[in-house]
Amino acid sequence: NAEYGFDKNGRQRYSHFNEYHKPQISLNHQWQIDYKSSLSTALYMSIGRGSGYSGQGRTSADRNMWKGTNYGVLNTTFRNPDGTFAYDKIQEMNAASPDGSRMIMSKSNNNHMWYGLLSTYTNQISKSLELSAGIDVRYYIDEHNNEIIDLYDGKYFSDDSSRANVKPEQNAAAADPNWVYEKLQVGDKVYRDYDGHVHQEGVFAQLEWTKKNLNAFVSGSVSNTGYWRYDRFYYDAAHAESEHVNFIGYTVKGGANYNINEKHN
């Protein structure tokens, strides 16, 4: 483990750590309408909560120093004689820096809420003809941000490498040149902070015909998928919500199968 090491207090440290929890809840209902038709419905929800460590720095060079290896080559900048990663050296560098921490650790949060409904109606129209049709509806919200969790002995951190890309016409705070160098503390957001929204609505149907050794079907579906984003990092509240974009999709399929005998078709 090229990132294994200790800080100046002898505490074990690491720059790679991931955790994720994603429970799923579903409610299913089966309705036998009559002897030839039925309705199957599932309502479900997925709750995802997780994060992983993400080393940040004032410059891209600083950020790369968090990597124990780079393309298979050992990073020796912060390396002790015994081979462990020298987290204490990062603390010393940050404490001595007059411009706050050069390297800090953030937690990359990636959460989601996913809701969905799937309902399928089946009807045995005749001995040889069966109809299946239904709806599929989903709504997905994902939350992504990077939160400072450790300044590594620096007094603050300035995320100027990211904030320099924020335009005043999109975020009024960027009109103040000092905002780019704001002195951030543990709990503040760096690099990104946004929510993504996705909704999908679809209908589908299939008609299947069976007669002795011959089976044929035709099916089709139509769906709409919409996207939009709410960005709190690069935009202020007046501009945070992006354009809503929708895409219509469809499928048409057909096929047939003939059973020559019990083993071949």
Residues of each region from the PLM?
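Signature of Gram-negative outer-membrane beta-barrel scaffolds
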Residues: 130-265
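Active-site loops and adjacent core secondary-structure elements that bind or stabilize anionic groups
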Residues: 41
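Hydrophobic, lipid-facing positions within transmembrane beta-strands of outer-membrane proteins
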Residues: 21-27, 113-119, 199-205, 250-254
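C-terminal/domain-terminus segments
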Residues: 46-65, 222, 226-228, 232-234
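Extracellular loop and loop/strand-boundary signature of outer-membrane beta-barrel proteins
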Residues: 10-15, 24-28, 102-107, 120, ...
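Acidic/polar loop-and-plug regions of large Gram-negative outer-membrane beta-barrel proteins
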Residues: 1-28, 53-106, 170-184
